[in-house]
């Protein structure tokens, strides 16, 4: 088999990036990935190696979205760039520019370097945040033609993803720019590769530990991280994907009580602690005034946001797995991690 081309994946310590690197290596690509801190290199190699990757075809280099250093070397010799890294705040920043500016400037740094090195195509992992946070007529599904209006009252994270993606499309319109394709995932679930859990995976972990004791009827669409990786590769290699954006969702939104029910049905005794009772919407809204974590959830109450995922399926032959399988795989992965941690003690 001829050696396939080299792909740069930004933000190699992240959840989506880790699964994307696994798939690229399994498919025969050479992969280079960036980390903010090169001290993470051994951890990343160990994590990917445990998951079965041939890590000898992986280079790890230091580059940070907030500075110019390292991007030129990172992109050199790569046919494709997968820009996955994005600042995700552990808490809402005091000033929204703390997250908006690095997201936008970081995306432009990657595109400038890709342009300078004649990269063939840059695939950007954006988010449903850039599509679905402005109102639509009730019941109409969100699709790739929709954009969040940053003048609406949206969180700094939502604004950052929208502003960064807009900047990418503006850049792509310039003569001589590489081809650009964008994937916009909804809530990304699936098996964690290490104990550094993404926000969505933390929801499943909390449910397995009996938290919150009463479940808000918050709803969100779900996609499996392995299916996101698959779609990112299709968006990279398929000629039709140039200049296109793709909403990545496995189907219509589910509620926290729906997810809890899947866990109980599929896991049996391992789901003994999963909460059974619901918290009425009015109580969530009242509590949100005092509990910041509930503020994000209170925005997910009421009518679920319908989504239309047909573009990726029909244009690129994408086949996302059923949501119940993703929820189960997430829980199984968490249980394996916790038993591995216990064995190490």
Segments the model singles out, each with a brief description of its role:
Residues 5-29, 34:
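N-terminal Rossmann NAD(P)H-binding glycine-rich loop of SDR-like oxidoreductase domains
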Residues 39, 49-105:
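NAD(P)H-binding glycine-rich loop region in Rossmannoid oxidoreductase-like domains
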Residues 83, 87, 93-157:
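Conserved Rossmann-fold NAD(P)-dependent oxidoreductase catalytic core, especially the SDR/UDP-sugar
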Residues 92-93, 149-154, 195, 202-223, ...:
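A conserved pocket-lining segment of Rossmann-fold NAD(P)-dependent short-chain dehydrogenase/reductase
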Residues 152-180:
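Active-site Tyr-X1-5-Lys
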Residues 175-178, 190-203, 235-246, 270:
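Glycine/proline-rich active-site loop of Rossmann-fold NAD(P)-dependent oxidoreductases
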Residues 231-294, 323-345:
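Mid/C-terminal beta-alpha module of Rossmann-like enzyme folds, strongest
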Residues 286-317:
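Conserved C-terminal active-site "lid" loop/helix of NAD(P)H-dependent oxidoreductases
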